[in-house]
Amino acid sequence: MDVNPTLLFLKVPAQNAISTTFPYTGDPPYSHGTGTGYTMDTVNRTHQYSERGKWTTNTETGAPQLNPIDGPLPEDNEPSGYAQTDCVLEAMAFLEESHPGIFENSCLETMEVVQQTRVDKLTQGRQTYDWTLNRNQPAATALANTIEVFRSNGLTANESGRLIDFLKDVMESMDKEEMEITTHFQRKRRVRDNMTKRMVTQRTIGKKKQRLNKRSYLIRALTLNTMTKDAERGKLKRRAIATPGMQIRGFVYFVEALARSICEKLEQSGLPVGGNEKKAKLANVVRKMMTNSQDTELSFTITGDNTKWNENQNPRMFLAMITYITRNQPEWFRNVLSIAPIMFSNKMARLGKGYMFESKSMKLRTQIPAEMLATIDLKYFNDSTRKKIEKIRPLLIDGTASLSPGMMMGMFNMLSTVLGVSILNLGQKRYTKTTYWWDGLQSSDDFALIVNAPNHEGIQAGVDRFYRTCKLVGINMSKKKSYINRTGTFEFTSFFYRYGFVANFSMELPSFGVSGINESADMSIGVTVIKNNMINNDLGPATAQMALQLFIKDYRYTYRCHRGDTQIQTRRSFEIKKLWEQTRSKAGLLVSDGGPNLYNIRNLHIPEVCLKWELMDEDYQGRLCNPLNPFVSHKEIESVNNAVVMPAHGPAKSMEYDAVATTHSWIPKRNRSILNTSQRGILEDEQMYQKCCNLFEKFFPSSSYRRPVGISSMVEAMVSRARIDARIDFESGRIKKEEFAEIMKICSTIEELRRQK
């Protein structure tokens, strides 16, 4: 059907149409090839912003380092990282003065966190740089490998299971003269196949020991691996993001815990809250500025943009902030928190995979690894790449680039927000000591600034003063990209404010549709997304009804499960028609079995199986929800599952949906091609790790999950738990005497085997 698009906007206020200008339909752009070029860009830019700083050499690694702190005063308009320590400290002092006790209280909260956090906190997160294999791995595997290497090198504090003890091992590892690691490699052999008598290549996976001297180990411990950020909309160029190794992660976690605790107490901070809570917080600040700007005052708002926030931040500034925030705290606590910024001041950026070359004439392709960039003849490269490599060469060591200034994306979001808020805090009249004053909102690098003054000159003066104050702490407001409006209309973190926040519905568009997990989860996620958008994003009833119909249509096409009485022919239609004809109560069939859709906007909160249960034929119920059915996944399904949905900005977010285990909740198997590569050993480790954890969870269901205290191993904990549970079950008559005896016998056998081992 052809719709004249202008008709859609006849009754819509202009600000609500903002959503249609966002680049959020269709697939987002992904990067291909290596991120080496983007990483070199980042390293070179970061050094350029700080180029008038002082050069020094790291005595341990020999890496050249640039320190712009307390260097020349920053210049107007040019982004720079020349923060002044005394200015940062003063901003911190004023922040504390206007929020008495804020640092003290946050330190106490964080001390508790430090003492209670378990090392498994580090298993959260996806890809992590694994220094033992010098490449990325899932976080849990990278942690397991690190701990394994630590143990084989005599570092065992981590066995207590506390994160702080693992960090003690990290500190000790840096003092060791050498570290021995195990690496995976693969051998290829040509052998004759007995069956076919042909020559085939046989691959075997080996593990070999390798010694790293102190310098090599330090370089690896301080390395951030880099990748290209994928799926970034509305940008022409890709950019690099970093993933740190396990040595850095734990320290960063504690610093961010402290900063998060501070942010929670600051009304101008857009972190760590999100969604509606964030909107309410922001609306409060705006309301305050508007009510306080009496009829005599003007109020203007800047929708702010900072130039290269991360690349102008400096870990040395963060160290100064932490030193100030923790100044009255115990020595051990101050030390733990100061390590992350110190490590970041000495960080190395891994350049990624290197460059791919192809020769059209000779039909050759070859990879130039990053390690070779320091020595290779530059005549093979085009001009722009040649310039990049020339610039970065003095910084290269073993395929990594020394990167002392700058912060890499997303590492200290909370702490950098504290810095931003401290400048917003200086806008109070008691600090500006003049007729203009300001307030605003800060969320990582995004900000909105509200300036009040009696006249336009005052507004201009206020903006100028804010701009210059920011410069002194290494924040560069972009004059080109920021714009100013009468207060009441602005944008902050993709929320659009026009006398209240307007729903920016296009942000949610990518999460509509079929997720592709399995038939059961997809149906549940699809209707939950529609329900959530009715609650949070002004999705009206008529549009929601239409979204629902489109979703069902999309779902049927994805899983080829058109209604049993349809004319559409697909690979499944023969089976589905047969089921349709055999079924007495056709309304009871799930949509994925060719049944009708019973959802409307009033019952989106009910899982489909529950919605149709009373309508189902008995034998259909039996097949659908029979735990002995081989097609039912035997994973115990929690009543609530988490799906990852892709909103348009920010990281993928986790969304809860109701899960009912049926024959449709299958879990696809892993791709087999990985099993023939050097990854195989790693994969087996990972599966074993997974199995142990799953088994452990069986013994300690989350409701009663108190970790075994003391030094007991996982096995001991499970055995003692099994005995307790068995006794309770036996005494309450849930199990027979024979079963009880058998359980006790198994427990004793396990203990006996452990003793023999």
Curated annotation (Swiss-Prot):
GO biological process, one term: symbiont-mediated suppression of host gene expression
One Pfam family per UniProt: Flu_PB1
Posttranslational mods: Phosphorylated by host PRKCA.
GO molecular function, one term: nucleotide binding
Sequence motif: Nuclear localization signal, positions: 187-195, 203-216
InterPro entries associated with the record: RNA-dir_pol_NSvirus, RNA_pol_PB1_influenza
Subcellular location: Host nucleus; Host cytoplasm
Keywords: Eukaryotic host gene expression shutoff by virus, Eukaryotic host transcription shutoff by virus, Host cytoplasm, Host gene expression shutoff by virus, Host nucleus, Host-virus interaction, Inhibition of host RNA polymerase II by virus, Nucleotide-binding, Nucleotidyltransferase, Phosphoprotein, RNA-directed RNA polymerase, Transferase, Viral RNA replication, Viral transcription
Superkingdom in the source lineage: Viruses
Catalytic function, reaction form: RNA(n) + a ribonucleoside 5'-triphosphate = RNA(n+1) + diphosphate
Enzyme class: transferase
Its biological purpose: RNA-dependent RNA polymerase which is responsible for replication and transcription of virus RNA segments. The transcription of viral mRNAs occurs by a unique mechanism called cap-snatching. 5' methylated caps of cellular mRNAs are cleaved after 10-13 nucleotides by PA. In turn, these short capped RNAs are used as primers by PB1 for transcription of viral mRNAs. During virus replication, PB1 initiates RNA synthesis and copy vRNA into complementary RNA (cRNA) which in turn serves as a template for the production of more vRNAs.
Family label: Belongs to the influenza viruses polymerase PB1 family.
Protein name: RNA-directed RNA polymerase catalytic subunit
Native species: Influenza A virus (strain A/Chicken/Pennsylvania/1/1983 H5N2)
Lineage start: Viruses, Riboviria, Orthornavirae, Negarnaviricota, Polyploviricotina
